[in-house]
Regions:
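Metal-ion/cofactor- or nucleotide/acyl-coenzyme-handling active-site neighborhoods
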Residues: 1-247
Length: 247
């Protein structure tokens, strides 16, 4: 494990926060939560946001302290290029408060070149994505010290890890619907398709082939294997949260 970390043994996360943090994911149920984010219900709550939340109008109203990115589309050319570039432009122009942006450590240089981010209020925090698969007691030690983290098969797992290791005692999850199989089907070309819905979708979402970051279509076996890893790593994070006294 120490060799896999490539000599980077410094823990980037410090327990300098406390209380409650709300992690805002992109599932369709977030539509019901958005109107409440600026009410007293969330008055003493910090926020962790993900992906394209930075292009939402409410982003500048709740002024999140934490932002997580892990999807390859934020680090290199892809079929979502225009949308990704708009997000980076929004972050450069709109963020006038101190905010941590968490990314994979191995992609920091690539991210800075690709994103063009130059906002001094945004602090890049590189995370060690090394995965440890051994004994639980060792895994928790490595997690605490930033030597390892769960497999980031979904950015929500990165956000939960950030919340735990930043010192929060309670992490509330919103929009983590994980409706991966609700509309799963194949089209006439035998391509795997789904209606992939997010809370920020303004138009009716159409059934379309499921594309990877490199624009190739997912195979069913690969897709199911990845989603199994999502739920397995949620179990791992739940055990880690309990070990750290976080609920």
């Amino acid at each position: 494990l120490l060799f896999q970390t490539k000599g980077n043994l410094k823990n980037p996360l410090k327990k300098v926060y406390s209380g409650k943090v709300a992690m805002l994911a992109n599932g369709p149920s977030m539509k019901n939560v958005l109107p409440r984010l600026t009410t007293d219900e969330f008055k003493n709550t910090d926020f962790i946001v993900l992906n394209f939340f930075g292009s939402m109008d409410i982003f500048t109203q709740i002024r999140p302290k934490h932002f997580c990115m892990a999807d390859p589309m934020f680090f290199q050319e892809n079929h979502n290029h225009d949308r990704v570039m708009k997000l980076f432009d929004d972050l450069n122009k709109k963020v006038d408060w101190e905010m941590n942006l968490y990314i994979p450590a191995s992609l920091k240089r690539q991210f800075l070149a690709f994103s063009g981010l130059h906002n001094s209020h945004i602090h890049i925090v590189p995370l060690n994505l090394t995965v440890y698969t051994g004994y639980e007691e060792f895994r928790h030690y490595f997690y605490r010290h930033g030597l390892s983290m769960p497999s980031v098969v979904t950015v929500a797992l990165m956000a939960i890890y950030v919340g735990i290791n930043s010192g929060y005692s309670e992490i509330d999850l919103y929009g983590v619907d994980h409706t991966f199989f609700d509309s799963l089907t194949v089209n006439s070309k035998n391509q795997l398709c789904i209606c992939d819905t997010h809370f920020y979708d303004k138009n009716k979402v159409e059934l379309k082939p499921m594309l990877r970051w490199d624009s190739t279509v997912w195979r069913m076996s690969d897709y199911l294997e990845e989603k199994m890893a999502v739920f397995k790593n949620h179990d791992i994070m739940a055990a880690y949260a309990v070990s750290q006294g976080v609920r």
